[in-house]
Swiss-Prot record:
The organism of origin for this protein: Leptosphaeria maculans (strain JN3 / isolate v23.1.3 / race Av1-4-5-6-7-8) (Blackleg fungus)
Pathway, per record: Secondary metabolite biosynthesis
Protein's recorded name: Phomenoic acid biosynthesis cluster cytochrome P450 monooxygenase
SUPFAM superfamilies: Cytochrome P450 (SSF48264)
Gene name as annotated: P450
Region (Disordered): 467-490
Free-text function comment from the UniProt entry: Cytochrome P450 monooxygenase; part of the gene cluster that mediates the biosynthesis of phomenoic acid, a long chain aliphatic carboxylic acid that does not appear to be essential for pathogenicity but may play a role in allowing to outcompete other fungi in the environmental niche via its antifungal properties. The polyketide synthase produces the long methylated aliphatic carboxylic acid chain of phomenoic acid. The cluster-specific cytochrome P450 monooxygenase may then hydroxylate the methyl group of carbon 31.
Keyword annotations from UniProtKB, A to Z: Glycoprotein, Heme, Iron, Metal-binding, Monooxygenase, Oxidoreductase, Signal
Cofactor(s) named in the record: heme
Length: 588
């Protein structure tokens, strides 16, 4: 037999094998019984996932419309821009479709997409039937499993310890740290004068709030075990080459990029290869993050062994984590050193990006909607007296529980501009699940399940809730349904209700997930964002900075455009505009 015949035979066998696998996949997808959408590519291809979301609008301008309509729903973050069901033709029809679930079929696999609140609730409740995907380990589990990436009994062990740690002591520490770093970092923006006429125009508000958020997470994460805040002003002590803040920030900012590669590979990246300097820097940051925290954990373990009390002035995550891990009698239920480091990274990376993103949206929303800012200012003035120089202490147990409107503002920001646009799970085995129409759907094992968070947060069930809590000056928009409007008052129940804040129906509000795997840092995030808004509005007002001749309506339209200019890089965030300027004016 000639070489050509051998080659052709092997090629035909390969094609037949691929065709058989594809046909079997189609049969499995059809057996689910939901509408199917075919795309002419592998939607899970690593390079496509990595590059397509960054080049979404470029692809849209280059591709023919018929091809773009097919490929657009394979781009990560498509749910921010497209209808919740691609079978619908109207781009505004995010939630009015009859079928809120469909199957996306590519060349290698298929995905089950849903915006059905009943399905979302069931998937998030059944944590052993629908597990965290392995892909998450490449992003957040470089040092070992943690509470965000583990499954099964391993997850239960992590969850038990982490929930002991992220408690009211941490929430109080976050509240106090938020006030401290707000005063320290925003002193040149939140200026005051005796005649109350101080006003500052700045393009640095986003950057400063990001710096505050990062400082809070480090401070609450490792406490004051060493002077990390001013460390970059000094030469790092050997064997370190980077300040702790710089190492952690470099690692976190690249967690969804080059940091998915092993640190050993990055640290030995060839000098002749492209990106040599960046690769080595990221690799070094990962190595030093691990080294630093191993040292801190060793210090804490030695302190506990000697029976000494903590020297930190506030509760910190790493000390509480070591204490909680060592408190159990069964050593198999404790966390290893690498698992503690992994949980610390998940705590910092997960919190930093999501909280900083929420603060960006919150600032734009404050400037865009003066009605709601006035509504918040009424509450701020009732909680925090105007007298004093602003340095007097504020009590967490007194202030935070009464910040009802401010927390409602935070919740509405998370509803419309939350960092998670989708939640991803894998069916651990064949599963059955009932959709809202009453039909039972059977999902084969290893089905990739995606919950469309954006669509859930725009459901008609959000419409016209708690209008009695609206400010007197509020007027509904004739141009958009209520669920698409930013209306924080929907979160405040009337007096005499069982709960102060509205509790959405199950499966309709999932910015921090839901069920047993709800984000353990949810309360911490709410406390931080709420406290920083209170600090911003304590004596000041935030307004859009207007160009000469620009009206307030023009400025507000510009902010509307900014709110639509979002990007997806693992999480949802505002596209940063270095020229976006705000006026911060003293009001009392």
């Amino acid at each position: 037999m000639s070489f050509a015949r051998i080659f052709i035979t092997i090629l035909l066998l390969f094609i037949l094998r691929r065709a058989f696998k594809w046909l079997k996949m189609i049969v499995d997808a059809r057996s689910i019984g939901l509408p199917m959408v075919f795309v002419p590519m592998d939607q899970t291809n690593f390079l496509w996932v990595l590059l397509s979301s960054r080049n979404r609008f470029r692809l849209q301008s280059l591709l023919p419309l018929w091809l773009w309509k097919r490929l657009s729903i394979t781009i990560p973050g498509w749910e921010l821009f497209e209808p919740s069901n691609p079978l619908e033709t109207s781009p505004t029809s995010r939630t009015e479709a009859t079928d809120t679930s469909f199957i996306l079929v590519g060349l290698r696999t298929y995905d089950f997409w849903t915006a059905d609140p009943q399905v979302a609730h069931e998937v998030l409740r059944r944590i052993h039937d629908f597990e965290q995907p392995r892909e998450l380990e490449f992003l957040l589990a470089k040092f070992g499993p943690n509470v965000l990436t583990a499954n099964g009994d391993q997850w239960a062990r992590h969850r038990k310890i982490v929930t002991k740690v992220i408690n009211e002591r941490i929430s109080k520490a976050v509240f106090e740290s938020s006030i401290y770093y707000c005063r320290r970092i925003l002193h040149d923006v939140l200026t005051t004068s005796p005649d109350k006429s101080s006003s500052v125009e700045t393009t640095m508000l986003f950057d400063k709030l990001t710096q505050i958020s990062f400082s809070i997470l480090i401070g609450v994460g490792i406490g004051d075990k060493f002077p990390w805040y001013d460390e970059e002003k000094q030469e790092p002590e050997p064997p370190y080459q980077m300040a702790y803040k710089d190492a952690l920030l470099t690692y976190v900012n690249n967690a969804f990029g080059v940091a998915i590669l092993p640190p050993r590979l990055l640290n030995h990246w060839p000098s002749w290869a492209p990106g040599h300097k960046k690769m080595r820097t990221v690799g070094r940051s990962m190595t030093e993050f691990c080294m630093r925290n191993k040292s801190l954990i060793d210090q804490e373990q030695n302190r506990i062994a000697r029976g000494e009390t903590s020297t930190s002035s506030n509760a910190d995550f790493i000390a509480l984590l070591v204490q909680a891990s060592q408190s159990g009698e069964d050593s198999q239920q404790s966390l290893s050193e690498n698992e503690m480091i992994s949980n610390l990274f998940a705590f910092t990376a997960g919190g930093y990006k999501t909280i900083a993103g929420a603060l960006d949206f919150a600032v734009v929303l404050l400037a865009r909607f003066p009605l709601w800012q006035d509504w918040l200012i009424e509450e701020v003035d009732s909680l925090i007296p105007a007298d004093g120089d602003g340095s007097e202490p504020l009590e967490y147990t007194t202030i935070y529980p009464q910040a009802v409107r401010t927390l409602a503002f935070v919740m509405e920001t998370e509803r419309l501009y939350g960092s998670a646009s989708r939640l991803f799970r894998i069916a651990s085995g064949p599963q059955t699940i009932q959709v809202s129409s009453g039909t039972t759907v059977r999902l084969p094992a290893k089905t990739r399940v995606h919950i469309n968070v954006v669509a859930l947060h725009h459901l008609p069930s959000w419409r016209d809730i708690n209008h009695q809590s609206d400010p007197d000056r509020f007027k509904p928009s004739p141009d958009a349904p209520d669920e698409k409007l930013f209306r924080p008052s929907r979160w405040i129940n009337p007096p005499g209700s069982k709960y102060t804040h509205f509790h959405p129906p199950k499966g309709t509000f999932v910015p921090w997930s839901q069920g047993p795997r709800i984000c353990p840092g949810q309360k911490m995030a709410q406390v931080e964002i709420t406290t920083l808004i209170l600090c911003l509005l304590r004596r000041h007002r935030i307004e859009p900075s207007r160009l000469e001749g620009e009206t307030l309506q023009d400025a507000e339209r510009g902010l509307d455009a900014k709110l639509q200019n979002v990007q997806w890089g693992g999480i949802v965030s505002l596209e940063k505009d270095p020229h976006l300027k705000f006026r911060v004016s003293q009001r009392r």
